[in-house]
């Protein structure tokens, strides 16, 4: 019988790990999926700003942290006392890679003595912001199986509207000028250009990130109201590319030369409808003008099958365990 890997997740009480947070994908991975895997023995340490590593010396094989910094990540202790003398590998989940411009990533790597980084982002995107010497693994996760197991049938949903949800840019001139001059990497148009463009169409229904009751674990319930939905991010795919297909939506998916969405395993017109800034209106019109064509349901079902298999949290944990082994 193989010996279980002992993993200690050290964290602070924080909004990001709350059940009430508007994003619960990371919470479900770290607090649920890891716990139910038989190959690891999880130890959860809820701490204050300072944690003494000697308390777990000889009791764990891996230290796991919510992120690589505590500047904006309020789940991470300010100090791991004694970490400089510890031989326990430290693995961290990353946040948004572009946030790395807000702090010294090498300084934080030394502060927490980080050995490995993981996240859902493509490795090439990670290394746009982090040193090539940092060890990183792309690990797909985000779909908590129980939340997507039983979804409303495709034909029972709203068909004549396409759902668009999440952050968008403000198109007013003074907002655009301000964003270009002062927001830099945080300019919404850098991330959500096509998503913003879609809102001008009469058959697109838009909901903001927080402008509805379906936040956190309830997000799939919003998606299940619609037969079709838009997953569009300009520079890098997000978990909407996992969640919308998993919810059974026919997903209009932005796939361009820069956002790495082509690496997610979907096939155009088979498991998703690929769109870009040039063809999105045409693709929408093809759907809206032929709502009852059975091919839309077939594509939605194929997308759901792929998403449930590829992006579920249990598979994510299996990949994470293989990453742990590289440091043992």
Could you describe each region identified by the protein language model?
Residues 241, 246-249, 275-276, 296-300:
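Active-site/pore-lining binding-face segments in mid-to-C-terminal subdomains
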Residues 29, 78, 193, 282-286, ...:
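Alpha-helical elements of Rossmann-like donor-binding domains used by nucleotide-donor carbohydrate transfer enzymes
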Residues 291-325:
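A charged, aromatic-enriched C-terminal amphipathic alpha-helix characteristic of glycosyltransferases
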Residues 3-60, 65-82, 89-243, 250-264, ...:
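Nucleotide-sugar donor-binding catalytic core of glycosyltransferases
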Residues 276-295:
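C-terminal "capping" alpha-helix adjacent to the active site of nucleotide-linked donor transferases
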